[in-house]
Each structure stands twice: as structure tokens, then as C-alpha cells.
Amino acid sequence: MAVVPGGPSSRPAVGAQFFCTAGRGLEPFLMREVRERLAATQVEYISGKVFFTTCSDLNMLKQLKSAERLFLLIKKQLPFPVSSVSKGKILNELQRLINDDPESWLNAISIWKNLLELDAKKEKLSHKNANPLKRKVGEDDITAKKLKTEQIQELQETKECQLEKQIEEKILEQGNFITEGEKFQKLQDDVTEAVDTRNQTNLTFRVSCRCSGAVAKTLTAQEVGRVIGIALMKQFGWKADLRNPNLEIFIHLSDVYSVLGIPVFRVPLACRAYIKTAGLRSTIAWAMASLAEIKAGAVVLDPMCGLGTILLEAAKEWPHVYYVGADVSDSQLSGAYDNLRAAGLRDKIELLQVSVIELPLPSESVDIIISDIPFGKKFKLGKDIKRMLQEMERVLRVGGTIVLLLSEDHHRHLKGGEASSGPLNSQGGHTEEPGGEERLTPAEKAAVSEPVSSPFAASNQGRLDRMPPLGSLVPVDCYRVSLGKTDALISKYKKSHSPGR
């Protein structure tokens, strides 16, 4: 699947094709977001990735909140049949990804160039008109530090490969592909020069690979990267540069698909510049807030706010709201205060040091409650979870919404101690890997086409129907999401009536 050639601007008339990576279970949130925020079309998903077409520029693309990383799509095709062919045959097929369709690569580079050029022009205009005294101090440092952390994590999780030294003997020793002091403007200038059609040989690149499933048993990421890298150098005359390339090529080979793309941003979208100290994953926090139906003028409470990540994400997206964060811990509230100050939201969010089971708020005074209920080895809540929910129920108005992040044990406790539907682990929930909509059942296809992107929630609806309400709190939605080493449930409830009625 080739991207559409770009014109003189960064907004091709028929749109460009992108894909985002997402934490497992967040795909429905991302599908809904790209439709609503980017007016995206041709939206489809596979486990961990959402594909779409949009005419949006970089400024709009940067605003995606439920995505981890954003890529410009070069190709998406069926997987290589590794079980029926030799390793040499597979390596030849890898070379054909470049040699059989070089035009799709040049089209992708053209669109990528146009996106960066227009963004650079807007950035220069913004700096020219801005008062330098009003610039936020420390934001670049925060981004750089977060980028370094994200790079280390990504290298560990995806076993990202570097092109080996055999590709080009004169390549500098492998290191981080971006240094903390590197300026994005220099990259844009280099790219503008390098991707000029008369100067293609000046373009430098590196290849990042990920292999999973049966492919990983046959090929290593290093082998794939070497073959792709050599093919690109021979086809286009590009030069490999592991430390500071103009361009990065990402390739993921699995049992379900083969995907190639170009990272649009060097800093992952999930790495928020406005969050000084990370607590809950920002994408999870935003997804929870997006379920809460926040409207202007509402009172929103996080009674166990920790470092305030949920409130930060909500306040950035829905600013005209009164936010209250509560926590019993001095250190957590101190971290939350630092985060609010760094994000410029100190006047938007009020912090209270109180216990979740003794909230100093009148009954039915809160419109929305969003909270990450602590769990794990450090937190043993047991039956206290029901006491907490009763206090939340008390302060919530009738018709109000509660969105909670729950462990399997907490979720089972709230269901009245019913047996779990199965162990909650990294393979639980809706983790099938359909190769786009062509692998979905008719019912799932209909669900995916809905504006709210509900195929994941639909798979849990049977369990929701059997769940007894906790007092006046009636379950509405339930999404199983990955937190890395473990999974959790984003559960949404509505208050149907006042207790005692």
C-alpha cells in the first residue's frame, strides 16, 4: 500500500496515510480520536496499531493523545509465509519491498518533506511574533529528558536493531540516534536539502526493526535491518547514519502483517512536555478522561490523584472545568503540585490532602469522578475498595459519571466476588490481531465502523450485563488495557439514583 504523492503543501488533496502505535486495549480510543480530531477516513486497526488517512497538518497530528508514536505509512501488506519458504527466499522478498515499488518510497519522502517544511515555516512565524519573555522555561529540557527515557524503553521493548557495521565501514560507532542538545530546526534544514530530487544521495537514514511471531524464529531484527538498509542504499544512493540520520525507517514483521513507515516525530506523542514527573501513563489517563463525558462548567474530582496525571490530561483537553485532586500522601501531592506548576495549570486544579473515605465535600456536589485505584504489591486495599466507592457515590450527583482504573481483583470485588472470567495477563481481553477489517467478522466490522469505535467494549458487554450495580452505580463500559507487565480494566459507571430511594 503506497502513500499518496504530496503536492506543494503538506496537505495532499486526498490525504496521506498514517499509522499510530497504541498500548494494547487503547485501539478503540485512538480510532475514535483520529475520526473526531483529524476527520480521518479509512480507519482500521490491528492489535497495537491504528491505520488511517487524513489531510491534517503536523500541528493537528501533534495533538493526538491516545497514541504512542505516529508514522507515515509506506507499505502495509500480508505477512511473509515463513513456514513454507527458505530463509534465502524471505530475504529476497524483503529486498523486493524496496526494489519492486521505489515510487511508493519517493512519494512517502515527498509527503514527509512537505509536512516538515510547512511546520518549519509556521514555527519561524510563531517565534517571530512571540514575546520571548513569555516562553515557558524548562520545557525543552523536560522533553529531552523524556526522550532519552523513551529511547531506552523502546530499545528494550522492541529490540530495535541498528544497521550493522558491515553496511558501511565508515559509520561512526553506534550511539543514541539523537542527542539531548540537537535542535529540530537543523534537522528540518538538512532534510529540505537532502530530499531535494536533485540531491537524493545526501539523505542519511537508519533502520529500526521489530520481528515477532514465527518471523522472529526465522529472522533476527539485525538480519532484516541489514537487508533493508543495503537495498535502500543501492536503490536510492542514501547513506546510513546510526547517530543522527535525516530519516528513520521503521519495519515490523509479524504473523499478521508486514508494515513499513517513517516516524513523523522523534519524540513519542505519549511523551508529554507538560508533565514534569510521570505517574500513570499519559495515554491511559487521557483515555479515562475521554470516557467521562466532561463538559464545560463541570466539577471533576480525582480522590486519589497521586501525581495528578489524570487531572493534567483532562485540564489540557477540557479547560473550562473546575478540577479537584485529593490524596492522603504528602509526597504525592508535592509531586502533583510541581506538575501543575510546570504545566501552567496551578489555577485550574485545586489540591486537597484528605482521605478518599472522608472527602470534605457535600453530598451530590461532584459531576464526574476519575481515578486510578492503586493496586499491586505496595497497595492491599481488600474490601476497602467498597468503602471508597461508597464515599465516591455519596459526593457524586445523580446522573454523574465515575471512571476507574481497576485491577482484576478490584473489578471482581465490585462484581460481588464472582469468579473471574479468566486470568488477566498480557494475552487477555481482545487481543486478536486481525489484518485490518478483512479479518473481522461481520458483526465486528459493523462495530468498527461506528463513530465510538466500540469493538473492544462490545466484547465485554455480556459481563457488564451480569454485573450487579454497586448501590446506585450502574456499570456502563469496561475496557481491558495493558499497563506493561500487567493489565487493568477501565470501568465506567453512572449514578442512577440517590441512595435510599
Curated annotation (Swiss-Prot):
Protein origin, superkingdom: Eukaryota
Keyword Nucleus: yes
Positions of the UniProt region annotated as Disordered: 414-469
GO CC annotations, alphabetized: nucleus; tRNA methyltransferase complex
EC number: 2.1.1.-
One Pfam family hit: UPF0020
One GO process term, biological-process aspect: tRNA methylation
Ranges for domain THUMP: 149-264
GO molecular function, one term: tRNA (guanine) methyltransferase activity
Compositional bias annotation for Basic and acidic residues: 430-442
Subcellular location: Nucleus
Catalyzed reactions: guanosine in U6 snRNA + S-adenosyl-L-methionine = N(2)-methylguanosine in U6 snRNA + S-adenosyl-L-homocysteine + H(+)
SUPFAM superfamilies tied to this protein: S-adenosyl-L-methionine-dependent methyltransferases, THUMP domain-like
InterPro entries, per the entry: RlmKL-like_Mtase, SAM-dependent_MTases_sf, THUMP_dom
Sorted UniProt keywords: Methyltransferase, Nucleus, RNA-binding, Transferase
Stated family: Belongs to the methyltransferase superfamily.
Subunit structure: Part of the heterodimeric THUMPD2-TRM112 methyltransferase complex; this complex forms an active tRNA methyltransferase, where TRMT112 acts as an activator of the catalytic subunit THUMPD2.
Function in brief: Catalytic subunit of the THUMPD2-TRM112 methyltransferase complex, that specifically mediates the S-adenosyl-L-methionine-dependent N(2)-methylation of guanosine nucleotides, most probably at position 72 (m2G72), in the U6snRNA of the major spliceosome. This modification in the U6 snRNA affects the constitutive splicing efficiency of introns that have suboptimal splice sites and can impact final mRNA levels.
Name under which the protein is recorded: U6 snRNA (guanine-N(2))-methyltransferase THUMPD2
Organism, as annotated: Bos taurus (Bovine)
